[in-house]
Amino acid sequence: MSPPLLKLGAVLSTMAMISNWMSQTLPSLVGLNTTRLSTPDTLTQISPKEGWQVYSSAQDPDGRCICTVVAPEQNLCSRDAKSRQLRQLLEKVQNMSQSIEVLNLRTQRDFQYVLKMETQMKGLKAKFRQIEDDRKTLMTKHFQELKEKMDELLPLIPVLEQYKTDAKLITQFKEEIRNLSAVLTGIQEEIGAYDYEELHQRVLSLETRLRDCMKKLTCGKLMKITGPVTVKTSGTRFGAWMTDPLASEKNNRVWYMDSYTNNKIVREYKSIADFVSGAESRTYNLPFKWAGTNHVVYNGSLYFNKYQSNIIIKYSFDMGRVLAQRSLEYAGFHNVYPYTWGGFSDIDLMADEIGLWAVYATNQNAGNIVISQLNQDTLEVMKSWSTGYPKRSAGESFMICGTLYVTNSHLTGAKVYYSYSTKTSTYEYTDIPFHNQYFHISMLDYNARDRALYAWNNGHQVLFNVTLFHIIKTEDDT
């Protein structure tokens, strides 16, 4: 392998790369995960001074990449001797705290006895003085009174004995606290720069760097499709549901369009949770009926094919009106060049990391698929690519990073069979199977924000995960 190629690293990333890393890798970072991975392909040290290391190409049994970060050897969060020592010290402190609480209650009780005894002793002292001053008149009743006073003082004896015991216990507590303080001081000095607060800051910093890295991994080649996850079961056999790939992180609205014809109603939900529960937030009545199920929401607007025409409509949800419409020249419509399942699926509108696209077929291209990149504002065709794949032989298709992926069927046993790169204007035949759980797919679209495939499968709204293959250049590579 040539030196320049040695500077290239291959990384497999799933649509849930960040969430998987946060849920699986951060626990290992702080010593809460002891899972052993297979030997990694590459080992890169992030910071020699810090001692952090990252495995960048380990694979789990499912073939997914797991970015594993190994903390320095002086990892305070691991279950080492220091952790056990701290737990033992904590138990001691808790036991001492309980004992001191009991001692405090007992002392308060005994103090009341002492106050009472003090009053009685003062009375006894006065009685002795009276006897001493009046020895001649000493009578039997004086001795009886003296005996009664002495009897009242008898309970003071066990109280004073308890005070002596408590005094010893307090002395013992003082010694234990002194030893505990010395141990904690030693641990604090040993911890030094590797305290929990700094470790927490390092984790946050590493998370930020990983997110920055993720932004650079927006494009890649499709390697695998996993799932599906069934989100909801609703509607007819055919329809579309989608989210906006350009929406902010806080904007998780879902749009729902049931059926492939004779409908103008779009239902909006504020979140996936509301969609699942059926809590609509708004309903839109479009000015035109749509054709097919291959609509797309992009940057706050709905793009759809007008019924019985090759006209594309741009409808703004915020403004509630049509912003643009344009005929897609030579594009077949009304089941002239649909996908294998029919349903007026002649014109497929889609979006990816690069922009807005239209996939269709023309007589000029012998019914084979044509890919056109559209201007999202004017709907003008900016550039087109003619492929050799018959549109009527395709089950569905979707765009990822400027590459069109075509399935060979909408039924059971479907797989991604063909791909065409608009970057290189080349095609290849592929073999990427996926699970058609409900036997009839009428909508399959990629969402670049979620890095997932949204599908309508025989009245079920489902999601597929995608695994992409990336080539990453090092900073030194020019």
From Swiss-Prot:
It is found in: Secreted; Synapse. Residues 1-23 form the signal peptide. In the eye, expressed in trabecular meshwork and neural retina; in non-ocular tissues, expressed in brain and lung. One of its GO terms (biological process) is eye photoreceptor cell development. It comes from the Eukaryota. One of its GO terms (cellular component) is extracellular space. Disulfide bonds join C219-C401. Residues 218-470 form the Olfactomedin-like domain. It holds the Pfam family OLF. InterPro entries: Noelin_dom, Olfac-like_dom, Olfactomedin-like_domain, Quino_amine_DH_bsu. Keywords: Coiled coil, Disulfide bond, Glycoprotein, Secreted, Signal, Synapse. Residues 77-217 form a coiled coil. Glycans are attached at N33, N95, N179, N299, N465. Peripherally associated with AMPAR complex. AMPAR complex consists of an inner core made of 4 pore-forming GluA/GRIA proteins (GRIA1, GRIA2, GRIA3 and GRIA4) and 4 major auxiliary subunits arranged in a twofold symmetry. One of the two pairs of distinct binding sites is occupied either by CNIH2, CNIH3 or CACNG2, CACNG3. The other harbors CACNG2, CACNG3, CACNG4, CACNG8 or GSG1L. This inner core of AMPAR complex is complemented by outer core constituents binding directly to the GluA/GRIA proteins at sites distinct from the interaction sites of the inner core constituents. This is Noelin-3. It comes from Homo sapiens.
